Amino acid sequence: MKNLTILGSTGSIGVSTLEIVAAHPEKFKIIALTAGENIDLLKEQIDAFAPQLVAVKNEELALKLEGMLSCRKTAVMYGVEGMIAAATASDTNMVVAAIVGAAGLLPTSAAIEAGKDIALANKETLVTAGRLIMDMVKTRGVKLYPVDSEHSAVFQSLQGHRKEDVRRIILTASGGPFLNLSGEKLAQVTVKDALNHPNWSMGQKITIDSASMMNKGLEVIEASWLFDMPAEKISVNIHPQSIIHSMVEYNDGCVMAQMGIPDMKAPIAYALTYPGRVPTGVKPLDLTTLSGLTFFNPDVVRFPALQLAYRAMKDGESMPTVMNAANEVAVAAFLSGRIKFTDIARSIEKTMDLHHPRSLSSIEDVIEIDQWGRERCSELLQSF
């Protein structure tokens, strides 16, 4: 029996995780849940899974939720303190880190410090504080399992093989909804257009990141930390069908690939049950029904965000933290209609140009640099 805390239970990953938990009650028990503002869905989850503790964004929402719970014995907390309490709950032995963005850093790092195994869906944790987090993982002796479909695919393709035999990691990308649009048309796309992903059902922020290809850039950085692999040994292939989720090429010329229908329940379940597997309800893959699988290199002129991620890795130190902070600010500005889609990468690059990388020796340093990046990007956007 695994006792779980889910950080971000009302988001796409959180909801899918709870579907797996509900299908296998003999394997999982929910100890704590956290959410932002969607307390109506959180109330349904409390009724279904009876957690000991839940945490929400602020005190106002916490009071409102308490009023909705009547005689439930679930404790309600709020803010960062509440998130950390959920992440470090004494009965929890695995934390599903599914909070979107840099907001997931503090509770995830607290969970690691408390000795909890991690199922990591929050890629920004490793993007912003990769060295610090991986050092904590080693020091505390915890297990960190990837939930992202691409990193799960790499993890599965590495099983039974030696790291020193790896020639390169190949992350696949669908290309998003704007794969074939010209640069001129990219400047005219709407929020509605950008949120219409062809293959995956995801939250708003990650869907926009997928459209800009920043999501793949973040995944390159995450893969570098997860698998201790330099950037030059991590490639990206556009694969519009999203059937092969990623590959590992070995020095003998063999390539191991993980395939499946695009459904996040599969990598979530693998992270929760490794090295075992459980039925997930994911539709079986029938290769005979596919017209073909195609692969090609990304267009970094039309989608410069991917190259910005490689630049951030090359610059190192605090630059990925600044890049991520600027991206979160720019995506929020696009979603609110304040900037054009093509302004996202432009504003990130300008923010990075203002930054001189410095070493990060603590999570507090990461938070300070993250704030710097947000402030600089916000200032830049005023002139767009």
From Swiss-Prot:
Molecular function, one GO term: 1-deoxy-D-xylulose-5-phosphate reductoisomerase activity
UniProt KW keywords: Isoprene biosynthesis, Manganese, Metal-binding, NADP, Oxidoreductase
One GO BP annotation of this record: isopentenyl diphosphate biosynthetic process, methylerythritol 4-phosphate pathway involved in terpenoid biosynthetic process
Cofactor(s) the protein needs: Mg(2+); Mn(2+)
Record: residues binding NADPH: T10, G11, S12, I13, G36, N38, N122, E124, G203
Pfam families: DXP_redisom_C, DXP_reductoisom, DXPR_C
Enzyme category, top tier: oxidoreductase
Catalytic activity from the UniProt record: 2-C-methyl-D-erythritol 4-phosphate + NADP(+) = 1-deoxy-D-xylulose 5-phosphate + NADPH + H(+)
NCBIfam families: Dxr (TIGR00243), PRK12464.1 (NF009114)
Similarity comment: Belongs to the DXR family.
Protein name: 1-deoxy-D-xylulose 5-phosphate reductoisomerase
Organism of derivation: Geotalea daltonii (strain DSM 22248 / JCM 15807 / FRC-32) (Geobacter daltonii)
Lineage: Bacteria, Pseudomonadati, Thermodesulfobacteriota, Desulfuromonadia, Geobacterales
